[in-house]
Amino acid sequence: MVSSGALAQSSSLACGELRTGYGPFDYRTDRNKLGIVEQYHFTPEVEELIRGKSSIHIGQDLSYTLTAFPNHHRALLSMMRYGEKLKTPQPPDVKYSVECYFERALRFRPDDAVARMMYASFLSKNARAPEAMRELEQVAKVAGDNFFTYYNMGLIYLDMKEYEKALTMAHKAMAMGFQKPELRDKLMAIGRWRAPEEPSSPVTRSGNDAATPSK
């Protein structure tokens, strides 16, 4: 049996060590470190895959951003879109494959539900539904009372044609007060929407019944 330590070592060999000259920092909590990276590397033009900032190569700026902040959610999304745009698992101007950047994010912060959902979406788009399902199961374990997480899980399940799971996630998000209609409308459009069941009321005896003496 392969140990978790051996798996981590194998992963780091394939997708690189996390230690770097600047970082690694957590995108969720180290916000005070973001400024320099987003000013000089992850600019709006880089995020939208228009042009590079520090060089002519968009991928170099994306790579730097995800080296300093492995779980930078917006940069992960841009990296995924970059691979899709060039129709390649590893664009020529980035250090690792697109999937490696998700692996690095989750190796760095396994509890990052957003990064894990994005990885599930990546797996789904690459026809790897069983793996995507496993990632979403992990997300559900840490979702807590975050209605936005359930809503986004529902959208991914919908893309995977897992309609009952998508419906369950929509109901959970609605029960928590989330009213954005997109997921519901998409389920309605394909005839898969059902309103949440109303909790059944306890059966009570009428006044007349209560007054009737037992025989």
Q: What kind of feature is each model-predicted range?
A:
Residues 78-81, 118, 152, 186-187:
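Canonical tetratricopeptide repeat
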Residues 64-65, 104-105, 138-139, 172-173:
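Canonical positions in the second alpha-helix
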